[in-house]
Amino acid sequence: MEAVTIVDVAPRDGLQNEPDVLEPATRVELIERLLAAGVPRIEIGSFVNPRQVPQMAGIDQIARMLIERGHNLAARTTNDLFRFTALVPNQRGYELAAAAGLRHVRLVLAASDGLNRANFKRTTAESLIEFSRFALNIRRDGLTFGVAIGAAFGCPFDGYVSPERVRAIAEHAVDIGAGEIILADTTGMAVPTQVAALCRTILDRIPDVTVTLHLHNTRNTGYANAFAAWQVGIRSFDAALGGIGGCPFAPRAVGNIASEDLVHLFNGLGVPTGIDLSALIAASDWLSATLGRPLPALVGKAGPVYPQVVSMAPYLS
């Protein structure tokens, strides 16, 4: 069965809403534990103003420490995606990421003006204009980039977000050179039928670009949404170790879907991820101890039924 790629965003989206700021060395240890478990892609942080998001302070130091410890920030996965990425909200963030050695970055905006204003102090259209300008610099510098579309399934401020608006943003992003589109359910508003419909539309309209789904489990629909997306052809998913995460600019944006719970789901479906579930659960236990609290992920508490990828042949005959 065709493999899926899991992008662990715990070092960025997972930690950015935590009350305590972890030292760069601790965040590097988190990244290395994810790598040791076989996680193929990791979002190492975001190049944002540390006064606004203090949890991301020292991201340039993290990149430097990874290089010093022998990690190649230009390394690629078996399906030719860059192993390391980071979020950049603007031109300055991109310049810092490029100077730190990143070869892939994720630009971010919201599909709704309400969330985009809360996060970036501008409308979605204004963010797209800025992206068009500095995408030229990204391509000139030989880097690649994706565009993360927040509030793709609904906005905590504006409510309904039309699929046509999301599609138009995704197509514009591809037109300016994006090689990845990340559809984000920022506050966990989506339901499976909605996810399947939008993912199918985006896959049909931009078939040659990686489409990644970024889900929050705010209302306990995250894993059903992931399964619905997989059924229509999504093969790349963001998730966060332990199910931690949230957005400081979006009310109630709690909890990414947990990497270990998602791996367990795919193991049971017979879908390879390349990730060692036991090692991932151990990493989650370490993160729980580091943060000093239980984490939302469940498979480590209950114990896995599917510690490895299983054959679905008995169920399909």
Curated annotation (Swiss-Prot):
Reaction equation(s) it catalyzes: (3R)-citramalyl-CoA = pyruvate + acetyl-CoA
Cofactor entry: Mn(2+); Co(2+); Ni(2+); Mg(2+)
CDD domains: DRE_TIM_HMGL
Induction notes from the record: Under autotrophic growth conditions.
Inhibition and activation profile: Activated by dithioerythritol (DTE) (in vitro).
Temperature effects on activity: Optimum temperature is 55 degrees Celsius.
EC number: 4.1.3.46
Alphabetized Pfam families for the sequence: HMGL-like
Keywords, alphabetical: Lyase, Magnesium, Metal-binding, Pyruvate, Transferase
Residue numbers binding substrate: 12
Gene Ontology molecular-function annotations: (3R)-citramalyl-CoA lyase activity; hydroxymethylglutaryl-CoA lyase activity; metal ion binding; oxo-acid-lyase activity; transferase activity
Domain of life: Bacteria
Active site as annotated: 247
Recorded effect of pH on activity: Optimum pH is 7 (at 55 degrees Celsius).
InterPro entries membership: Aldolase_TIM, HMGL, PYR_CT
A biological process from GO: L-leucine catabolic process
Binding site for a divalent metal cation: 13, 214, 216, 256
Subunit structure: Homodimer.
Classification via NCBIfam families: PRK05692.1
Record-stated family: Belongs to the HMG-CoA lyase family.
Function: Involved in the glyoxylate assimilation cycle used to regenerate acetyl-CoA and produce pyruvate as universal precursor for biosynthesis. Catalyzes the cleavage of (R)-citramalyl-CoA to yield acetyl-CoA and pyruvate.
Name of the molecule in the record: (R)-citramalyl-CoA lyase
Species annotation: Chloroflexus aurantiacus (strain ATCC 29366 / DSM 635 / J-10-fl)
